[in-house]
From Swiss-Prot:
Highest taxon, organism lineage: Eukaryota
High-level lineage: Eukaryota, Metazoa, Chordata, Craniata, Vertebrata
Chief place of localization: membrane
PROSITE patterns: EGF_1 (PS00022), EGF_2 (PS01186), I_EGF_1 (PS00243), I_EGF_2 (PS52047)
Protein name, as recorded: Integrin beta-6
Length: 788
C-alpha cells in the first residue's frame, strides 16, 4: 500500500509539463546536480538505465523516470519532511507552577528541506491566565522630573493593588538615569560636578549614567520607601542617557532579578529625548557599546564614560534576547520621537505622560492590557539565505496574509500561524533558528537541514571496471572519471579529445553547437522543442516552416528541416490538399467549368467568375443563349444557306447533329423564344473530345398571323362609335345648361317691381362737390355743371 501511494505521489508531481522539461534540460551529470535543479527533479541510479552517452536523461521527474523504465527503488528523490522532537500541549487555565506553563506549540522540530522546495509549519500560541509579571520602573531623575518624583512616592502600593486584579504573581523594581557625566553633556567645574544644580540654587546629586536601586520584589512598601529617598540630578543638554539605562536593565538579568517564566515589563519614564549611537563621540567616547552588563558593586553603570551609547539595533537585539517589553511613558513633546523608536522595537508601546506623572498608573495598566491583547512572532538565529513567510490565523479563523501578528486577543485565546520555510540553494550546514512570541520565554526551536545528498552517493565503486578498465569511480549509475579521462564510461583519453571529427565542416562549430563531442562522436543536447539528431547534431524535427502556428501545417512531419507531407497533402508547408471534392459545383462540374482547383480551392480563370466554385459569373452567358444565333440560323435557312450557319455555329463553339440516337447523360435542356415568337427547344451535349453538340432542335407553339382587314374594320367602327357617343354627351350638356339659364331668367323677371314716377335707370345731370382746401373764408358755393 505504501509503495502504491508513493507511486501516486510521483505521478502527481509529474503532471506539470513545464516542470518535467526543466529537469531533463538542466544538464545535470550527477545526482547532486539533479537535486539542485528543483524539488520536482529525481535521479535514476539504475545501471544501464540509458545509453551511456545519455547521462542527462537520468534526471527527470519521478513519473517520467518510471515511464522510461527506471525501477522505483533506484529513484533518488529525497522529499522535504518535518520531524517533531517536542510538542507539549498548550496550557489551559491557571498553572500552579510557572515552569509548567506552555504557551507555544510545538517546541522543537527538525525541518529537512530540498533546495527550492518549501515546507509549511503550523505554530500555535496561547497566553496563559495569571502569568507572572516582573515590572522594572526606570525613571529619568534630571531636574525637570522633580514634580514627577513626588507624584510616584506611593506608586508601588497603588500599582501592586491594580496589578493584583490581573495576576497573582507580581514584582516590581526601580532604577534611575540621567546622563554620561562628561563634557559637553555636563559642566565639569568642581562646583558643578559636586552640585549640578548650584546655579539655581538647589542641591541635587552629582550626574550619573544609570543606577540600579531596587531589584525586583513583591514588597510594594519597600518600593515606596526607595522612591521617597530619591533625589534629582541635572545635566546640560536636553537629550538624556536613557538608552544606556535600558541596555543595562535588559542585560543585567541577575542583578535586576528577571525571572525566566514571567512577563518582563520595562517602564521607561522621561520628558526628554535620548542619546544613541555615535552621539558620545562629542565627548571623545569612541568605543562601541558591547551590550554586556557593567554594574559595579554599587549597582552603578561603570562604563558610562568609556562606551558609546547603544544603537537602536543593539537595543532591539538585547530586548528581544531577554524577552523585555518596553513601555515608553513620555511627555507630549516627546511622543512622536518615541513612537518612531517603538515602531522599530518589537513589542514596544508608547504612552502619553502628564507633566507630573499623575497618570502613570493608568498608563502602565493600559500598556499591560494592550501587550496582553497582542500575539506577535519574532524570528531569531541564523536566517540569512532562508525565505520565511507567515500567515496569521486570528480570532474566528480570520486569515492575514504575510502577517505574524494577531491583535484584539483575549487571554486564553489561541493564535495560529502558518510558517512557510524555503531554502533557495543547497548549503552544507544546518541552520538553527528560534520562532517565539514577542515578550514571552516560550519558543519553537527549529533546526533546518538541507537535503542535498543522494543515498546512492554512499555506495562508491572506486576504480570500477564499469568505468573502462578502472578509469573512474562508479556512483549513482554513472562514472566519475579520473583526471585525464572523460566520456560516459571514461573511455576517452587525452589523445581523443580532438573535436575535428565532430565538425561537419572545418569552419563549423563542434556538433553544430547543439551537442558535446565525446570520444570523437557527437552527443546531441536535449531540447524542449523536440529531438536533435544526426552525426553532427545538424538535424532536428522542429525547425521546419509553420503554417497557422502548426509545424508543417499539422499535415506532415519535420525531418532535418524539411516537411515530409502525409498522404493527400503537398506543398512546402504541407498545407495544400490534393482532394478536389470541395471544388465541385452543385451541377457536378469542377469549378463550374470556369476555373482550376488549386489546393482544394477554386481559382477562377473566366473573367467575372467568382464564388467558392466559380458559380457566379454575371458576364458569362448561359450555354443556351450563347447558341441562339446558331439555332435561329439553322431553322430559318434552307439548302445552301445552311452552310452559312456552320460558321455561326463554330463561333458559338457548337456543332448541330441530326442524329436521333444519342446519349442524353449530362445533357443540358434549353428553351429559347425565336424571332417569330416560336418556342425553340434543343439539347446540348458534350462528346468525348469535349466538343459541344446540339441535338433535337424543335420549333413549337408558334402564334398565328393577325387578320388585318378585320382589325381595320374593328378600329374604324370603334372610332365612329366613340364620335357618336361624344356628340350625344355634348348635346345633353348643352341642353341642360340652356334649360337652367331660362329658368333663372324667368325667376328674376317674376320678382321685378317697377315704380311709376321715376325711371330707375335715370341719372341726374348735376353734381355738387366741396372744396377741401378752403378755410376761414366766406363760404362760397360752387356749382359745377357736368354733362352726364
Amino acid at each position: 500500500m505504501g509503495i502504491e501511494l508513493l507511486c501516486l505521489f510521483f505521478l502527481f508531481l509529474g503532471r506539470n509539463d513545464h516542470v518535467q522539461g526543466g529537469c531533463a534540460l538542466g544538464g545535470a551529470e550527477t545526482c547532486e546536480d539533479c537535486l539542485l535543479i528543483g524539488p520536482q527533479c529525481a535521479w535514476c541510479a539504475q545501471e544501464n538505465f540509458t545509453h551511456p552517452s545519455g547521462v542527462g536523461e537520468r534526471c527527470d521527474t519521478p513519473a517520467n523516470l518510471l515511464a522510461k523504465g527506471c525501477q522505483l527503488n533506484f529513484i533518488e528523490n529525497p522529499v522535504s519532511q518535518v520531524e517533531i522532537l517536542k510538542n507539549k500541549p498548550l496550557s489551559v487555565g491557571r498553572q500552579k507552577n510557572s515552569s509548567d506553563i506552555v504557551q507555544i506549540a510545538p517546541q522543537s522540530l527538525i525541518l529537512k528541506l530540498r533546495p527550492g522546495g518549501a515546507q509549511t509549519l503550523q505554530v500555535h500560541v496561547r497566553q496563559t491566565e495569571d502569568y507572572p509579571v516582573d515590572l522594572y520602573y526606570l525613571m529619568d531623575l534630571s531636574a525637570s522630573m522633580d514634580d514627577d518624583l513626588n507624584t510616584i512616592k506611593e506608586l508601588g502600593s497603588r500599582l501592586s493593588k491594580e496589578m493584583s486584579k490581573l495576576t497573582s504573581n507580581f514584582r516590581l523594581g526601580f532604577g534611575s538615569f540621567v546622563e554620561k557625566p562628561v563634557s559637553p553633556f555636563v559642566k565639569t567645574t568642581p562646583e558643578e560636578i559636586a552640585n549640578p544644580c548650584s546655579s539655581i540654587p538647589y542641591f541635587c546629586l552629582p550626574t550619573f549614567g544609570f543606577k540600579h536601586i531596587l531589584p525586583l520584589t513583591n514588597d510594594a512598601e519597600r518600593f515606596n520607601e526607595i522612591v521617597k529617598n530619591q533625589k534629582i540630578s541635572a545635566n546640560i543638554d536636553t537629550p538624556e542617557g536613557g538608552f544606556d539605562a535600558i541596555m543595562q536593565a535588559a542585560v543585567c538579568k541577575e542583578k535586576i532579578g528577571w525571572r525566566n517564566d514571567s512577563l518582563h515589563l520595562l517602564v521607561f519614564v522621561s520628558d526628554a529625548d535620548s542619546h544613541f549611537g555615535m552621539d558620545s563621540k562629542l565627548a571623545g567616547i569612541v568605543i562601541p557599546n558591547d551590550g554586556l552588563c557593567h554594574l559595579d558593586s554599587k549597582n552603578e553603570y561603570s562604563m558610562s564614560t568609556v562606551l558609546e551609547y547603544p544603537t537602536i539595533g543593539q537595543l532591539i537585539d538585547k530586548l528581544v534576547q531577554n524577552n523585555v517589553l518596553l513601555i515608553f511613558a513620555v511627555t507630549q513633546e516627546q511622543v512622536h520621537l518615541y513612537e518612531n523608536y517603538a515602531k522599530l522595537i518589537p513589542g514596544a508601546t508608547v504612552g502619553l505622560l502628564q507633566k507630573d506623572s499623575g497618570n502613570i498608573l493608568q498608563l502602565i495598566i493600559s500598556a499591560y492590557e494592550e501587550l496582553r491583547s497582542e500575539v506577535e512572532l519574532e524570528v531569531l538565529g541564523d536566517t540569512e539565505g532562508l525565505n520565511l513567510s507567515f500567515t496569521a490565523i486570528c480570532n474566528n479563523g480570520t486569515l492575514f496574509q504575510h502577517q505574524k501578528k494577531c491583535s484584539h486577543m483575549k487571554v486564553g485565546d489561541t493564535a495560529s500561524f502558518s510558517v512557510t520555510v524555503n531554502i533557495p540553494h543547497c548549503e552544507r550546514r544546518s541552520r538553527h533558528i528560534i520562532i517565539k512570541p514577542v515578550g514571552l520565554g516560550d519558543a519553537l526551536e527549529l533546526l533546518v537541514s538541507p537535503e542535498c545528498n543522494c543515498d546512492c552517493q554512499k555506495e562508491v565503486e572506486v576504480n570500477s571496471s564499469k568505468c573502462h578498465h578502472g578509469n573512474g569511480s562508479f556512483q549513482c549509475g554513472v562514472c566519475a572519471c579520473h583526471p585525464g579521462h572523460m566520456g560516459p564510461r571514461c573511455e576517452c583519453g587525452e589523445d581523443m579529445l580532438s573535436t575535428d571529427s565532430c565538425k561537419e565542416a572545418p569552419d563549423h562549430p563542434s556538433c553544430s553547437g547543439r551537442g558535446d563531442c565525446y570520444c570523437g562522436q557527437c552527443i546531441c543536447h536535449l531540447s524542449p522543442y523536440g529531438n536533435i539528431y544526426g552525426p553532427y547534431c545538424q538535424c532536428d524535427n522542429f525547425s521546419c516552416v509553420r503554417h497557422k502556428g502548426l509545424l508543417c501545417g499539422g499535415n506532415g512531419d519535420c525531418d532535418c528541416g524539411e516537411c515530409v507531407c502525409r498522404s493527400g497533402w503537398t506543398g512546402e508547408y504541407c498545407n495544400c490538399t490534393t482532394s478536389t471534392d470541395s471544388c465541385v459545383s452543385e451541377d457536378g462540374v469542377l469549378c463550374s467549368g470556369r476555373g482550376d482547383c488549386v489546393c482544394g480551392k477554386c481559382v477562377c480563370t473566366n473573367p467575372g467568375a467568382s464564388g467558392p466554385t466559380c458559380e457566379r459569373c454575371p458576364t458569362c452567358g448561359d450555354p443556351c443563349n450563347s447558341k441562339r444565333s446558331c439555332i435561329e440560323c439553322h431553322l430559318s435557312a434552307a439548302g445552301q444557306a445552311r452552310e452559312e450557319c456552320v460558321d455561326k455555329c463554330k463561333l458559338a463553339g457548337a456543332t448541330i447533329s441530326e442524329e436521333e440516337d444519342f446519349s442524353k447523360d449530362g445533357s443540358v435542356s434549353c428553351s429559347l423564344q425565336g424571332e417569330n415568337e416560336c418556342l425553340i427547344t434543343f439539347l446540348i451535349t458534350t462528346d468525348n473530345e469535349g466538343k459541344t453538340i446540339i441535338h433535337s432542335i424543335n420549333e413549337k407553339d408558334c402564334p398565328k398571323p393577325p387578320n388585318i382587314p378585320m382589325i381595320m374594320l374593328g378600329v374604324s367602327l370603334a372610332i365612329l362609335l366613340i364620335g357618336v357617343v361624344l356628340l350625344c354627351i355634348w348635346k345633353l350638356l348643352v341642353s341642360f345648361h340652356d334649360r337652367k339659364e331660362v329658368a333663372k331668367f324667368e325667376a328674376e323677371r317674376s320678382k321685378a317691381k317697377w315704380q311709376t314716377g321715376t325711371n330707375p335707370l335715370y341719372r341726374g345731370s348735376t353734381s355738387t362737390f366741396k372744396n377741401v382746401t378752403y378755410k376761414h373764408r366766406e363760404k362760397q358755393k360752387v356749382d359745377l355743371s357736368t354733362d352726364c
